[in-house]
C-alpha cells in the first residue's frame, strides 16, 4: 500500500536511528572513492568532490523532498564541468575552480526556479528511449574518462579535462602494466566478493586490498595524491566572485555568458538523474515524495556546496539504493553519510592519499557497467524502431558534441521522440465520405487534427467535387492547434468558393472555442 501522507518530523528523522546511522556510515565509505574519481573527471583537486559530497548530503538531508536519498558529486554532472574548468584554467591557471563554483551557484538558482515552475511535471514525459540513450552515453563517458590512468592517452582537445588528467598522470609502460594488473584484481574483488558476503561494500574492500598491495610493494604508480591535495580541515566559506589576482572570477556579463551553458546543462541533467533515483526509491519503499520540493532542495544544496568549495552534484542511484537496502529510511541516514565522510577524510587523509588510481579506475568501470542500460541493449532488436532511433539520437548527439553534452543529447532525443510520436498520431486521423443523396455529401472525420495530421486531413476531401450541400461531421475529432483550425478553414473556404453550402457539425466545445478565436472569420455553422 502506498503512503500518501507526509510523515511527521520525528519520523522523517528518527524513524529507525540505529539502522540509519549504520547505513549512513556504510554509504560514506562508498561515496569517498566516487567523489575523488569524479573530481578527476572534472579536472579539479579531490577535495572539491569530497567537500561537495559533504555539503550536498548534509544540506539535502535538511531541505530535500525525498528521505534517505543520497546526493553527492556524480559522473553525469562532472562530465559537464570538464570544458568550463579547462577553459578557466586556460584564462588564468587555477581560475577554473572559481568558474566552476560560479557555475554551481547559477545551477542552484536554476534548479530552485525549476522547482517553482514544476519542471518535474514536464520531465514525466521524457520517453524511455531518451533515458536509455542518456545512461548509455553517461556510462561510455565515465569509461572514457579512465583512459589516461590506463595509458590510453588519446587527444580530446585543448580544453578537455581528460587531457588535463593525462598531463598530471604521466606514466610509463612498467607502471601501465602494474596499473592494469591492479585494475583486473580490483574488478575480480568487486564482482567476486558479493558471492561470498554482502556485509561490507565490495568496492571498499577492493580499495583497501589494492592500497595495501601498492604501499607494501612500493609500486611507483599514480595515487590519489597525484591528483592534488586532500582537505586538512573543514570546508570554509568562499565567494567565487572578485579580483582575478585573488583567484576569483569577475562579476560581469562575460563571466555569466561563460558559465551559463554549463550551469543550465547541470541543472537539467542533475534533476533528470535525481528524479530517476527518486522514482526508484519511491518504488522500493512503497512511498511517494515531492519532486518539486526535491528540485528546490537540490538547488539550495548546490549553492551551499559552491559557497564552501564543493562541486555541484545530484542524487546517486547506486548509493541511494544501497542506503535503502541497508535499512536507511529517514533523513538521518543522509545526514550521517555526509558527516561520516567528512570525518573520515579529515582524520584519515594520510591513508586516503595513498589509494592507487588503479583502485578508483576499477570502481569507476563497475559504475559505468551498472549505469548502462544493458537490458535495453540486449533487446534492441525487439523494441520498436522509433524507440531505437530516439536512443541512438540521444547517444550520438551526446558523444559527438565537444565537449560531450548530455543535456543537448537529451533535448535532441526528446525532439526526435516528439516528431516520431506526432507522425504516428497524424496517421490515426481518418476522413470518410458518404453520399447522402444526389445533392449532398457527408464527410465524417475521426482522430486528432493538429499541425502534423493536417496533411492527411486535407487529402481526405475532394475539393473538385461541388454538390449543393456538404456536411463535415467532427463529432469524433478534436482540433488541437492553429494548424488544425487553418486546415478546416481551408476546406470550408474552398468548398464555398465552388458554390457548395458547407455545414460543420459535432465540434466539441474546446475545438469550437479554438475555432471561434482564430478561425479568421469563417463561421463553421456547427449544430
Please state what every model-predicted region is.
Residues 1-420, 424-429:
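Transmembrane helical cores of multi-pass ion-transport proteins
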Amino acid at each position: 500500500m502506498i503512503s500518501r501522507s507526509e510523515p511527521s518530523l520525528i519520523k522523517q528523522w528518527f524513524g529507525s536511528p540505529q539502522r540509519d546511522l549504520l547505513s549512513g556510515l556504510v554509504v560514506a565509505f562508498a561515496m569517498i572513492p566516487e567523489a575523488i574519481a569524479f573530481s578527476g573527471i572534472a579536472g579539479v583537486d579531490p577535495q572539491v568532490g569530497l567537500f561537495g559530497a559533504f555539503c550536498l548530503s548534509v544540506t539535502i538531508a535538511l531541505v530535500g523532498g525525498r528521505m534517505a536519498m543520497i546526493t553527492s558529486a556524480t559522473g553525469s554532472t562532472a562530465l559537464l564541468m570538464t570544458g568550463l574548468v579547462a577553459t578557466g584554467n586556460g584564462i588564468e591557471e587555477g581560475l577554473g575552480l572559481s568558474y566552476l563554483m560560479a557555475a554551481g551557484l547559477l545551477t542552484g538558482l536554476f534548479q530552485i526556479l525549476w522547482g517553482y515552475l514544476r519542471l518535474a511535471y514536464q520531465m514525466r514525459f521524457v520517453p524511455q528511449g531518451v533515458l536509455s540513450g542518456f545512461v548509455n552515453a553517461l556510462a561510455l563517458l565515465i569509461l572514457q574518462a579512465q583512459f589516461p590512468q590506463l595509458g590510453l592517452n588519446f587527444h580530446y582537445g585543448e580544453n578537455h579535462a581528460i587531457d588535463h588528467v593525462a598531463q598530471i598522470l604521466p606514466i610509463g609502460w612498467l607502471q601501465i602494466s602494474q596499473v592494469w594488473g591492479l585494475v583486473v584484481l580490483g574488478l575480480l574483488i568487486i564482482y567476486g566478493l558479493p558471492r561470498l558476503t554482502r556485509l561490507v561494500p565490495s568496492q571498499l574492500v577492493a580499495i583497501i586490498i589494492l592500497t595495501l598491495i601498492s604501499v607494501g610493494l612500493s609500486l611507483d604508480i599514480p595515487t590519489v595524491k597525484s591528483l592534488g591535495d586532500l582537505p586538512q580541515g573543514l570546508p570554509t566559506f568562499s565567494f567565487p566572485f572578485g579580483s582575478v589576482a585573488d583567484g576569483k572570477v569577475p562579476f560581469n556579463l562575460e563571466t555569466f555568458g561563460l558559465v551559463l551553458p554549463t550551469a543550465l546543462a547541470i541543472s537539467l541533467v542533475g534533476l533528470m538523474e535525481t528524479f530517476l533515483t527518486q522514482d526508484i526509491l519511491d518504488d522500493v519503499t512503497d512511498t511517494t515524495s515531492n519532486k518539486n520540493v526535491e528540485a528546490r532542495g537540490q538547488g539550495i544544496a548546490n549553492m551551499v556546496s559552491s559557497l564552501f568549495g564543493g562541486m555541484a552534484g545530484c542524487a546517486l542511484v547506486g548509493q541511494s539504493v544501497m542506503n535503502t537496502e541497508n535499512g536507511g529510511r529517514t533523513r538521518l541516514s543522509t545526514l550521517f553519510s555526509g558527516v561520516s565522510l567528512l570525518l573520515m577524510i579529515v582524520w584519515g587523509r594520510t591513508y586516503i592519499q595513498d589509494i592507487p588510481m588503479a583502485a578508483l579506475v576499477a570502481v569507476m568501470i563497475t559504475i559505468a557497467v551498472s549505469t548502462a542500460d544493458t537490458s535495453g541493449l540486449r533487446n534492441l532488436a525487439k523494441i520498436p524502431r522509433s524507440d531505437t532511433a530516439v536512443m541512438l539520437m540521444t547517444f550520438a548527439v551526446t558523444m559527438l558534441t565537444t565537449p560531450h553534452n548530455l543535456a543537448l543529447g537529451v533535448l535532441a532525443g526528446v525532439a526526435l521522440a516528439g516528431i516520431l510520436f506526432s507522425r504516428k498520431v497524424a496517421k490515426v486521423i481518418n476522413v470518410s465520405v458518404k453520399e447522402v443523396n444526389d445533392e449532398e455529401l457527408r464527410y465524417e472525420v475521426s482522430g486528432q487534427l493538429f499541425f502534423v495530421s493536417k496533411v492527411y486531413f486535407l487529402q481526405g476531401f475532394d475539393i473538385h467535387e461541388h454538390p449543393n450541400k456538404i456536411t463535415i461531421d467532427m463529432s469524433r475529432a478534436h482540433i488541437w492547434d492553429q494548424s488544425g483550425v487553418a486546415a478546416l478553414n481551408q476546406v470550408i473556404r474552398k468548398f464555398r468558393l465552388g458554390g457548395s453550402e458547407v455545414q460543420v457539425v459535432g465540434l466539441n466545445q474546446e475545438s469550437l472555442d479554438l475555432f471561434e478565436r482564430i478561425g479568421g472569420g469563417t463561421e463553421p455553422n456547427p449544430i
